[in-house]
């Protein structure tokens, strides 16, 4: 790293179209600043941040249809997904367990399988990029500890058939984990069946630092029953608290406080307005790209995927646009809260300049 790079200012968001993180809500910024030195990993020593974590988990439970949630504010969706697999493995009867997930599942499940020493079985998706239910059913067996469904896939913004996956999981006495890390803050305002209220979901990932407008790091790990956290707990003899179910020891009090502040400021009306605006932006961009002849995947949630030649993609990156590709090389644009209609119009102007 050169000295110039070390002095580089923080990332501006005026051309960021690929990230699932966004600018935090002002109230979340202020709250995070006040709790920079606190550690929710030691709740007896830091009771104020521990209280805020309990309140944040309660509000997340309200969002996902769980009246008595158990969980904590994690570093992000990767940690929450790993913890879901870890809890299921620890509660399973089998010695060598497997995890069944759709091929569209986040790459964090590959990390979880590697770290935890479990087998990851990936089922293909159907023609609309959702989990193929029949393929999932073919992959589960008596050693399956957890079946994974995604509520808002990273690449195409699709929602897997969660109730059907729940039936498959129940048939082999496995947990059902829903990864709603990105989609969890928009799905309450849709007709999708995805939450704890819609199916016998055991665990869920939902990230306030994505569509929740909380500062990074602020993920969420939620469980239906306390036994899930018991399966994760280890003794912590030198702390004021006796046990700890979290993956990290020292954790971000700023993330906890910021998450609670954004939840209090925006749930439900602010998040409803945000969903309507971001979904409208996604539909606008999809329609404009389709009108220009690109093959576009219909945006079910605020994410647009479209076929785009590599030369055009690279030229747009050279213009400063932070864009990414799916595994099948489609252009991927995430319409996060910081993405405005004016930003998308400027992006389209640069697309037109390539013609």
UniProtKB/Swiss-Prot annotation:
InterPro entries: GrpII_AminoAcid_Decarb (IPR050477), MfnA (IPR020931), PyrdxlP-dep_de-COase (IPR002129), PyrdxlP-dep_Trfase (IPR015424), PyrdxlP-dep_Trfase_major (IPR015421), PyrdxlP-dep_Trfase_small (IPR015422). One of its GO terms (biological process) is coenzyme A biosynthetic process. SUPFAM superfamilies: PLP-dependent transferases. One of its GO terms (molecular function) is aspartate 1-decarboxylase activity. Keywords: Decarboxylase, Lyase, Pyridoxal phosphate. The keyword Lyase applies. Its EC number is 4.1.1.11. Its cofactor is pyridoxal 5'-phosphate. The modification N6-(pyridoxal phosphate)lysine is found at residue 210. Belongs to the group II decarboxylase family. MfnA subfamily. NCBIfam families: tyr_de_CO2_Arch. This is Probable L-aspartate decarboxylase.
